[in-house]
Amino acid sequence: MRPEKLDAEAIAEQLHRMEGWVLAEDGASIWKAFRFRNFAEAFSFMTQCALAAEKLNHHPEWFNVYNKVDVTLSTHDASGLTELDFKLAAKMDQAAAGRMPDHLK
């Protein structure tokens, strides 16, 4: 079953609860830059997020260089944002908690 695309009001409400996530200019995706102490922490984060993504059957677009992981979330089947994007964003924030140095949060 295809996830339902969220309207602008629902997206704004969800983003209000999410720290650091930014709505793309086109309104079709959200993104966040995560920074960690080192590569091992970044890779550990990505591994934990990959397992969560598999459970949700919803997968991020991400880019990793050393301690940096840039994430973009969108639901391509809905041509925009759905609840799945915000569920995965919350899981990613949980996975990052405790791994990110305070000065990088």
Swiss-Prot record:
One of its GO terms (biological process) is tetrahydrobiopterin biosynthetic process. Keywords: Lyase. Signal peptide: none annotated. Pfam families: Pterin_4a. Its EC number is 4.2.1.96. SUPFAM superfamilies: PCD-like. It catalyses: (4aS,6R)-4a-hydroxy-L-erythro-5,6,7,8-tetrahydrobiopterin = (6R)-L-erythro-6,7-dihydrobiopterin + H2O. GO terms for molecular function: 4-alpha-hydroxytetrahydrobiopterin dehydratase activity. HAMAP family: Pterin_4_alpha. Belongs to the pterin-4-alpha-carbinolamine dehydratase family. This is Putative pterin-4-alpha-carbinolamine dehydratase.
